[in-house]
A protein has these predicted regions:
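Acidic Gly/Asp/Thr-rich repetitive segments characteristic of extracellular carbohydrate-active
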Residues: 28-59, 204-213
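A conserved hydrophobic secondary-structure block that centers on an alpha-helix together
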Residues: 194-244, 311-314, 320-346
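Surface-exposed or flexible loop/turn and strand-edge residues in extracellular/cell-surface modules
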Residues: 26, 32, 40, 51-52, ...
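C-terminal accessory/interaction regions of large nucleic acid-associated machines
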Residues: 544-703
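Short glycine/acidic-rich loop motifs that flank beta-strands on beta-rich extracellular proteins
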Residues: 83, 87-88, 103-104, 281-288, ...
Length: 703
């Protein structure tokens, strides 16, 4: 009987609490005049808001938040203006802070509460001219560096743990702006040794402050990390004790070496800001923030700490939720997102957003995340992403093929720009592009076009329009993986564009598993695999450097499937630091010529660092490791190295198993340094170096 009563009590409590979240609240305190938060005359009744209050900042009133701290307010609805003081440090403790018009408010921490909403509580009509406003500094007049403005999100009993605590902007204005930093993250200027308590960086950071939290990122690949939330890592956290231009004194010595010379250097990132939004209880119920459609404002140089609800869809530290083009001109600049349990910055059904100079440090699941594949014309520039952990799939997530396994940057629509970003020590990927068509997902989506119209298009055909000057190092498994379309891709005039990419200290460096791609100026250093599992079809590589890559520097088509779907050209390929490795080839030969027309053309290939005492090591071209295929297609793949024997005298290399090529009338033999035990070569002439692509730039600016 006690058990039955307990169950009935539990059900009664559950049904009593949750519907309450959808009921309009009665405000206990309302603003009735412009004035300071700490002035009783601002309020009706004439007293300061106290613990547990539900507070309304009434329309046509402006309240200056000047409190050094507050008790935990249950709910604040900003229908007028709540402006944080700029002449003192302030702290607001609150469970639910909603910026929205009207006097009607519920305790839902995701949905909005006014008219013109859809069934999910999302705005579908433009607001009036006067916008409710939460202003914690502005971009032109941020909170001065001498002061802090802090919003602490507390969970209170009776709130829905899936929704609260929260900071939500519903077709209103929300401005969160701290004191700018010239560079929120920089590169090391000199190598740090274990035991060093002073570091040198490559740029002046005199605007950083004593007491700031910083990280020095990993320089080595520690291990295959998996989740690695509780595993050994190479990134180290420290506190600044002193700053002198380029020199930073730490609170305690470093444990590991961190590279700071040459091409490949670790980063130093500042995690402190003077505008802070944080969960009050990181080990308890965490909070989240979001902008809804038709909102205004932006975020700069703020810290978002201990936010994100693990495993809950839509509850992220920074979330632009289905805003479409309505927030064009908004930006997230110089933000630090620290210790998130659900992403760093989520761009969901949103276009024309700028995310620049941000630092993401520790996330469960992907970090910088574009959620449903419809997002276009967003720009992610000069952001740092460190330690995105393996996370759970989210219930009802829009892209069912995404395992949420820990990428610093994850996106599914190529019409977004990623430039000058760095990914470090993430569980699975530094950068991951993935777009699949499945029985439970149709990749034909309604997408914004450059002319402003909308069109249903297979987003797998939209090229990665600009992926430039990005870097990845010390990753758990992959550095850059562009894959998933099963051979569907863009046309020859709009190839995927990958430029100026730097990858080091990783396992799989560059998974180029998309057709129709131009990749130029790619540096790979200290990887196990270089170009890995490529979908060779209209691939053009220029100026590719692969160094100290010990297993398969330039993989065959689709690796163990050994399938080449079309032709490739490689102009400028340098192999170096070959001090280890066995008899694997530098370039693996694909066995199967899927359409019968595939060819591979190489030019300006150099090899440095072979061991002269081991001529059997590192032949230039051979079948390589893994299965020894007998070709399943009638034709093999011919490989041409232009000018190998001198100007106009080319090498043609084939697999010794390709019967059709063995019978093409040429005399094949092994060539020292060029062929291995399962490849043969001959000298040919009169072979043109093909032009596979004819790229044009006919897209508008991104933001």
């Amino acid at each position: 009987m006690k058990t039955i009563l307990s169950i009935l009590l539990l059900v009664t409590t559950f049904t009593a609490v949750l519907p309450a979240q959808r009921e309009a609240v009665q405000f206990s305190v309302k603003s009735v005049a412009d004035g300071d938060w700490t002035n009783p005359k601002t309020w009706q009744p004439q007293r300061l808001p106290k613990a547990g209050d539900r507070v309304l900042i009434s329309s046509r009133t402006s309240v200056r938040f000047d409190a050094k701290t507050t008790p935990v307010i249950r709910l604040i609805q900003v229908a007028g203006t709540l402006r944080f003081a700029r002449d003192r440090s302030t702290e607001l403790n609150v469970c639910l802070l909603k910026v929205q018009a009207g006097n009607h408010c519920t305790e839902r921490g995701f949905a909005c509460d006014f008219n013109s909403l859809n069934t999910n509580g999302e705005p579908n009509a433009q607001p009036g001219k006067s916008l409710p406003t939460l202003e914690v500094g502005t971009q032109q007049n941020p909170i001065p560096a001498a002061h802090t403005a802090r919003i602490r999100l507390h969970y209170l009993e009776g709130m829905d743990k899936k929704d609260a605590p929260a900071l939500v902007c519903c077709s209103a204005r929300m401005e969160l702006h701290g004191s700018p930093l010239k560079r929120p993250w920089v590169k090391l200027g000199a190598t740090c040794q274990p035991g060093d308590a002073k570091i040198v960086v490559n740029e002046n950071v005199s605007d950083w402050r004593v007491g700031d939290e910083i990280i020095v990122t990993a320089s080595k690949k520690v291990r295959n990390m998996g989740t690695y939330r509780d595993e050994e890592v190479g990134t180290e956290e420290r506190i600044v004790k002193a700053i002198d231009g380029h020199s930073i004194t730490l609170d305690k010595p470093l444990r590991l070496e961190h590279s700071g010379e040459g091409e490949f250097r670790s980063e130093v990132a500042n995690l402190s800001r003077n505008v802070i939004v944080e969960s009050a209880d990181p080990d308890g119920v965490r909070g989240h923030t979001m902008y809804h459609r038709h909102s205004k404002g932006g975020i700069s140089y703020a810290r978002f700490a201990h936010l994100g609800k693990e495993g809950e869809l839509g509850r992220y530290p920074i979330h632009f939720h289905l805003v479409g083009e309505t927030m064009r001109g908004s930006a997230v600049l110089g933000v630090a997102v620290v210790d998130s349990h659900n992403r760093w910055v989520t761009i969901h059904g949103t276009q024309y957003l700028l995310v620049r100079d941000c630092v993401g440090y520790k996330s469960v699941g992907h970090g910088y995340f574009l959620e449903n594949g419809s997002e276009v014309f967003n720009l992610l520039d000069r952001n740092l992403g460190v330690q995105a952990f393996n996370g759970p799939r989210l219930k009802d997530q829009e892209l069912p093929f995404d395992p949420n396994d820990g990428a610093a940057f994850w996106w599914a629509n190529g019409r977004n720009v990623l430039t000058r970003n760095v990914a470090v020590e993430n569980a699975k990927y530094g950068f991951r592009y993935d777009c699949q068509k499945r029985s439970n997902f149709d990749s034909n989506l309604r997408v914004l076009m450059p002319d402003g119209s909308r069109k249903i298009v297979d987003i797998r055909t939209l090229a990665i329009s600009r992926f430039e000057k990005n870097e990845s190092h010390s990753e758990g498994l992959y550095s850059v993986a562009l894959a998933g379309t099963e051979g569907v891709g863009p046309d020859l005039r709009h190839p995927h564009l990958i430029r100026d990419l730097k990858i080091w200290q990783t396992h799989y460096a560059f998974r180029a598993q998309l057709p129709t791609m131009l990749a130029e100026n790619i540096q790979i250093d200290h990887a196990v695999y270089g170009i890995y599992r490529p979908w060779f079809e209209n691939h053009v590589y220029r100026d590719l450097s692969i160094a100290a890559t010990g297993s398969e520097p330039f993989n065959r088509g689709l690796d163990d499937k050994s399938m080449q779907h079309g032709s490739i050209t490689v102009d400028g390929l340098a192999f170096s630091k070959l001090s280890y490795g066995g008899s694997m080839p530098l370039i693996q030969i694909s066995a199967n010529n899927v359409n019968g027309e595939a060819e591979s053309h190489f030019r300006n290939v150099t090899v440095r660092g072979r061991d002269p005492k081991r001529p059997d090591r590192w032949p230039l071209m051979n079948l390589g490791g893994g299965p020894r295929f007998k070709p399943s297609t009638p034709k093999g793949v011919p490989y041409f190295i232009h000018d190998y024997f001198g100007p106009g005298k080319h090498a043609k290399v084939i697999s010794s198993r390709a019967k059709d090529l063995l019978e093409d009338g040429n005399k094949y033999s092994q060539e020292k340094g060029l062929t291995g035990d399962e490849s043969l070569a001959t000298k040919v002439s009169g072979i043109d170096f093909p032009e596979l692509l004819s790229p044009v730039d006919d897209l508008p600016p991104c933001t």
